[in-house]
């Protein structure tokens, strides 16, 4: 595909990175959290993940050799700006820590996790989508993760690929999926971290 001068210039742009994430960092636990309302009810629903501390990242002079890790990523719900750059940032981050790390994208949203449809995201693929809009790199979907059978089916492929962290990018419904999945995997000792990344055009995660 022939690229225009604008496309080439746009791809070369380097997004701004917080100072704390430049170079070595350390994670610092802060105060324990609680919901704005209905604390008791929510704690009953999420007994293993409710009330976790705020984590901040600070610069560190300590440099560690980190082991390679495999990470999965899902684009979920309606398209929103920045989805591709979240994936690019994940790729750059895990590769900077250890070049042997791998990033896997699940195709067409949460359904790809359940149906075991995925692709390894390489530098060649990532570079085609840097600084572009849409959720086109791996596609998106609106499958809700809400049953034990779905959770267990997803865990099968996560274990097969030796994935230790799963990032779900989307709006409020998508991050609800992430919460429910994280609670189940924590309760069962699955050994998979689930991270929700807010990404929406409707600001529903702020309401």
Give the ranges of each region predicted by the language model.
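Short Gly/Thr/Asp-enriched flexible loops that form oxyanion-binding sites at enzyme active sites
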Residues: 86-90, 173-188
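Short, ordered loop/turn segments at secondary-structure junctions
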Residues: 76-78, 106-112, 142-143, 171-173, ...
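Short coil/turn connectors at secondary-structure junctions
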Residues: 66-71, 98-101, 132-135, 161-165, ...
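Conserved small/polar residues in nucleotide/adenosyl-binding loops
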Residues: 204-207
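Glycine-rich oxoanion-binding loops at beta->alpha junctions
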Residues: 34-64, 113-164
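Short glycine-rich or small-residue beta-strand-to-loop segments that form or flank ligand, phosphate
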Residues: 70-80, 136-141, 164-170
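N-terminal phosphate-binding or glycine-rich loops at protein starts, especially the Walker A/P-loop
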Residues: 1-15, 65-114
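N-terminal low-complexity/intrinsically disordered extensions
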Residues: 1-69, 96, 128-130
């Amino acid at each position: 595909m022939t690229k225009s001068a604008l496309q080439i210039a746009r791809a070369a742009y380097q997004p701004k990175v917080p100072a704390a994430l430049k170079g070595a960092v350390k994670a610092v636990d802060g105060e324990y959290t609680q919901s704005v309302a209905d604390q008791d009810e929510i704690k009953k629903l999420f007994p293993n993940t409710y009330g976790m501390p705020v984590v901040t990242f600070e610069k560190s002079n300590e440099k560690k050799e980190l082991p390679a890790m495999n990470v999965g990523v899902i684009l979920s719900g309606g398209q929103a700006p920045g989805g591709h750059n979240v994936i690019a940032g994940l790729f750059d981050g895990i590769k900077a820590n250890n070049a042997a790390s791998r990033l896997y994208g699940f195709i067409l949203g949460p359904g790809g996790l359940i149906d075991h449809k995925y692709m390894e995201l390489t530098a060649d693929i990532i570079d085609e989508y840097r600084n572009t809009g849409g959720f086109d790199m791996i596609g998106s979907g609106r499958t809700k993760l809400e049953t034990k059978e779905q959770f267990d089916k997803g865990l099968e492929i996560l274990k097969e690929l030796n994935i230790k962290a799963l990032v779900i990018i989307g709006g409020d419904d998508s991050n609800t999926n992430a919460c429910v999945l994280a609670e189940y995997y924590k309760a069962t000792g699955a050994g998979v971290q689930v991270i929700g990344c807010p990404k929406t055009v409707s600001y529903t995660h702020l309401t």
